[in-house]
Design a protein with these regions (language model features):
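Alpha-helix N-cap/helix-start capping motif
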Residues: 10-11, 21, 48, 121
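Short, flexible helix/strand-to-coil boundary loops that buttress conserved ligand/catalytic motifs
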Residues: 9, 17-20, 128
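Phosphate-/nucleic-acid-contacting segments
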Residues: 63-143
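Ligand-binding loop in jelly-roll beta-barrel domains
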Residues: 1-11
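A generic structural signal for short hydrophobic patches within well-formed alpha-helices
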Residues: 13-14, 124
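Polybasic "coupling" helices that flank or enter modular domains
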Residues: 18-90
């Protein structure tokens, strides 16, 4: 995709915010959404056990893909290997394999042949304490 990039001076941006307060609101709202995602990822690494962290990550990927019409509460295509999942989660590939088996045997999610299937979406979201509102893209930025 072609894009065009330009440098914007901070003073020019602040002037634009002063002239158009609604623009400032939109930019700050978008930044707060990004910050909420970063905070959620820090909680993942610092406070969640490997099983909950993996479940949360798979749910978040699904929610992000749903925003662009590529995922649902049924599941989604996921070409990531267990090695890539391990890197993203800060776990070993062997540990990810064990965790995925535990989640599958518990009847919550199956990760097989490049597809994540949510076998019991509601139970999985409860287990992972997943609340997708931190990624909310449906609420209008301006009313």
């Amino acid at each position: 995709t072609d894009i065009e990039v330009t440098e914007v001076l901070a003073t020019d941006l602040l002037d634009a915010f002063e002239r158009t307060p609604r623009l400032a609101t939109v930019v700050l709202w978008a930044a707060s959404r990004d910050e909420a995602m970063v905070v959620e990822h820090l909680v993942d690494v610092g406070r969640r056990a490997a099983t909950e962290r993996t479940a949360h990550f798979l749910l978040e990927l699904g929610a992000r893909l749903a925003l662009v019409g590529m995922g649902s509460k049924v599941g989604y295509a996921c070409p990531l290997s267990q090695y890539l999942l391990a890197d993203a989660l800060g776990l070993s590939a062997v540990h990810v394999n064990r965790v995925l088996r535990q989640l599958r045997e518990a009847g919550m999610v199956t990760f097989r042949d490049g597809f994540v299937a949510f076998d019991d979406y509601d139970r999985l979201t409860d287990f992972a304490e997943f609340d997708p509102t931190y990624m909310d893209q449906m609420t209008p930025l301006l009313k």
